[in-house]
Amino acid sequence: TFEEEVGGYFTNIERGPKFNPFFIPKMIADIAAGHISMIYGFHGPNYATVSACASSTHSLIDAFNNIRLGKADVIVTGGAEAAISVAGIGGFNAMHAISTRNEDPQTASRPFSASRDGFVMGEGGVCLILEELNHALARGAKIYAEVVGGGMSADAYHLTATHPEGLGAKLVMQNALSDAEMKPEEVDYINVHGTSTPVGDISEVKAIKSVFGDHAYELNISSTKSM
């Protein structure tokens, strides 16, 4: 792995570096997108979005915008995470973001629970095919869902802590609703960030209540991190 190769370099530095010739190509974030384009011969926009936990959602919005701007008819978009490593676990543990409920790992990650104390590290990946509506209809494609809008923002607050009032999350949802030309009352489900941390979950709830008002109590809400 990249981490092992870097670690090996510093461990054996006195004997000289032994880098694999593919070290740099494997290191860059957009190599995953590059592999997809090379395998399938795709010549459209090709890059990786790097925005921490929002990367996959941002890639979805980027794909949506490229299609509605006429830059492409079909785009493969998605994301992956493989952070279970010494550096990944050590770093998140130092931030006190990981649950210490080791005796009950199956239910340790419990977003919005009063007894939450952090998340459980996991890995995974997913890709979606986004296609211009008329293009999909013309070829008789099975359409699973329609993307109607997206929003982006930032807390502009702290390196690791979310804004205590959830300002960034509030702006994101407002921007998404505006872009989709939807009213808050038309939303019935939110898949939240839900880190299961004492600070993060509170700010997210505040943001939802601020945007949706009384309708917030009618929403179905869940976090993938609880699964």
Where are these regions (language model features)?
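Active-site-proximal alpha-helical scaffold in enzymes
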Residues: 32-40, 45-81, 119-141
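Solvent-exposed alpha-helices and their adjacent loops that cap or buttress functional pockets
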Residues: 16-17, 29, 40-43, 67-69, ...
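Condensing-enzyme catalytic core mediating Claisen C-C bond formation in acyl metabolism
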Residues: 103-180, 189
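A glycine- and small-aliphatic-rich helix-loop capping segment at beta-alpha/alpha-beta transitions
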Residues: 1-16, 66-69, 89-102, 164-168, ...
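Acyl-CoA/ACP chain-elongation machinery
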Residues: 73-117, 150-164, 192-202, 218-227
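Conserved small-residue
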Residues: 36, 56, 63, 92, ...
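Stable alpha-helical structural segments in soluble proteins, enriched in small hydrophobic residues
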Residues: 59, 172-180, 207, 211
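Conserved beta-ketoacyl condensing-enzyme motif
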Residues: 1-51, 80-89, 184-200
